[in-house]
Amino acid sequence: LRTSALVLYYHAPIDIMHALPNEAGTLCYAGEWHRFPSHFFVPPQVRVEFVESAFRGILPHHFRRGNASDPLWPWAAYTRTSPTHVNDRNAHEPDRYVALSQCSWLVDTHADDTWEPLMCRPFVDNEASRLAAQTWPLPAKIRATVARALYVPGWDDSLVWRSYCLLRRRA
């Protein structure tokens, strides 16, 4: 039941990666940065960056680039060095962002007219579903809570959905 819920309700971040063109460019994440599935889904010529959003904590940092010459562990040059731009307070680091104008593609739940959707998938909005359930009688609250975590046929009508999109800059 849990696995089914994960695939049906929360798979959109992986699904949209299949629509990413196999060409060089910059894929940007805004408010949905924490749902980035993995670099395994991104073509090697695509660089992943972040654009400024309402989030004010620390964002992931890129590994150092260098010459991967060690045949046993080619990532040694990248992983054996201590990063210099980290803090232990989860403090905002402005150097983690790029300008939106540098982005070829954007992953977000909404955008203005300068972007066109390449692929959008439905995605359960946990916070909105939880808030909506607070106004319901107790049995409906329980149903909505269970429906977010486990797939129970027919119970997904108590969930609030939104679109999770891969967007391309309009020409």
What are these model-derived regions, one by one?
Residues 1-109, 123-134, 139-170:
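Membrane-embedded, lumen/periplasm-facing catalytic core of multi-pass transferases
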